[in-house]
Amino acid sequence: MAANNLSYTIAPLEHTPLDEIAAKVDLVRKTFRSGRTKDMEFRMKQIRKLYWAIVDNTELMQDALIKDLRKCKYEAVLAEIDWCKQECIDMVNNMEKWLRDEPVPNVPLQFRAMKHRTRFEPLGVVLNIGSFNFPFQLNLPVVIGAIACGNCVVLKASESSPNCAMVLKKIFDESLDPECFTYVNGALPETQLLLEQKFDKICFTGGKAVGKIIAQKAAETLTPVLLELGGLNPAFVTKHANLKLAARRLLWQKSLNAGQVCMSHNYILVERSVLSQFLGELNNQMRTFFPQGAKNSPDLCRIVNAGHFNRLKKMLDGTNGKIVLGGSMDESTLFMEPTAVLVDDINDSMMTQEAFGPIFAMMAVDSLDQAIDIANTVDPTPLSLSAFGSKAENNKILDNVTSGGATCNDAFFHSQIPQSPLGGVGQSGMGNYHGIYSIRTFSHQRTIAEVPYWADFLFRVRYMPYQWPVMNRMKAVADSKPNFDRNGNKTKGITYFLALVLGLGSKKSKGALLRWAVLVVAAAILEAKKGVLSQLLTR
């Protein structure tokens, strides 16, 4: 039933009683073992019902986001609600295709009768411990992917966005089978007790410190984890960048959700020759974004709570740099203006701590090589990076700086569609999800072979007593020959030259087909011209 009239009042966060948590997990475990969630139509129906629960509770979701983050309705729809709806639709429309058995590629001829393939099978019970900054967009897609793969789910939303946690509970209650998909609300005690239960996958979005604790706890039972953590994400601006667009897009990255985005930049490395111009563009864009000032803007979120506000303020208080953009704040309303600090030391507080807010460092560099060295020193495995430069410069950054994801000439657009994978690398996390990538994350690819009884003669070689003549006959038929020499160089035998001739000089099948098509068309044209010429000569 629709809740868009807001007649429903969001209750204060209700902590799940500790003595109910184990029973909740046991119930969904029992349901999984019954096989109920393995039915494809059941999974699709659950996701469809979830979609309509999101639609029906849209205004309630907006209200919760306003209360928790002062996130405006526009941004709630843009960055949260529509994203979740699209994830539902994309999954329902494609999951049957994505979940089909996949044949094992490159199977030798003598083994093809065995029908080797991989089958996507559900893992079991998935625990998702969510984050506060995008309470719907970072929670529901994990649930959608896990449901699509046939798992049962336990959701633990963040207590730092309590109104959103209660709306998520309502959405679960209204749309999903409670014996398959359940929730736990609470804080540290509830989370600790959850981690004492046995799960088949644990997903966590948040900071490194908690991520390490969860990984250690999961290791006790060899439970796989999906960790989407943060990082000291760099942005690069070279003298060949479009400075106006770079400023506009990077400022947006620190204004969206008040910069409380795990993929937003922590610092910008700017080529010294364009630093002054780039700073001017940043300040121009600030005035464009917030014509009445950032504090008076109805579009700018607030910091989630006093603890995070004070953490950000401490970073600014501890810097030896100079504020060159913004700088205003109001603790009573948790307002903090997008703020840039020009620093000259990679050990500055603005460079060593993850901001996860609207503040960021800027540092001048003399070359792209210097910028790359700094980025690899500050954090060799960030979650994200943004590169603004020429195509060659951007490629050089991609080749020399590792990150979970990267966007050239814009801000974290690599993760702005629900079809692309989101995930970290190294210290910024492990695993990824969204769309088809959720299928691999929340499934076990089980290898299957079906060996027909009649094929036994093909594999006489394996049976005792072993006989060398049988081995030699098999090797004569099936033994692979290397196409490389002892120095590791590729050899060019008759097969290579035959393929080159048949491919008309192209090493790839597409190129060969295109060349043959051109050849056939050219031959047809020549033949037609020849016919016309013959007719003219016979007149």
UniProtKB/Swiss-Prot annotation:
Listed PROSITE patterns: ALDEHYDE_DEHYDR_GLU
Keyword Iron-sulfur among record annotations: no
Induction or repression: Expression is increased about three-fold after 30 minutes of illumination, and decreased thereafter.
EC number: 1.2.1.82
Annotated keywords: Carotenoid biosynthesis, NAD, Oxidoreductase
Reaction(s) catalysed by this chain's protein: 4'-apo-beta-carotenal + NAD(+) + H2O = neurosporaxanthin + NADH + 2 H(+)
GO CC annotations, alphabetized: cytoplasm
Residues annotated as signal peptide: none
InterPro entries: Ald_DH/histidinol_DH (IPR016161), Ald_DH_C (IPR016163), Ald_DH_CS_GLU (IPR029510), Ald_DH_N (IPR016162), Aldehyde_DH_dom (IPR015590), Aldehyde_DH_NAD(P) (IPR012394)
Enzyme active site: E228, C262
One Pfam family here: Aldedh
Any Gene Ontology biological process: aldehyde metabolic process
GO molecular function terms noted in the UniProt entry: aldehyde dehydrogenase (NAD+) activity
Family named by the database record: Belongs to the aldehyde dehydrogenase family.
Function summary: Beta-apo-4'-carotenal oxygenase involved in the last step of synthesis of neurosporaxanthin, a carboxylic apocarotenoid acting as an essential protective pigments and leading to orange pigmentation. Converts the aldehyde beta-apo-4'-carotenal into neurosporaxanthin. Is also able to use shorter apocarotenals as substrates (such as beta-apo-8'-carotenal (C30), beta-apo-10'-carotenal (C27), or the acyclic apocarotenal apo-8'-lycopenal (C30)), indicating wide substrate specificity. Neurosporaxanthin is synthesized from geranyl-geranyl pyrophosphate (GGPP) through several enzymatic activities.
Protein name according to UniProt: Beta-apo-4'-carotenal oxygenase
Protein's organism: Gibberella fujikuroi (strain CBS 195.34 / IMI 58289 / NRRL A-6831)
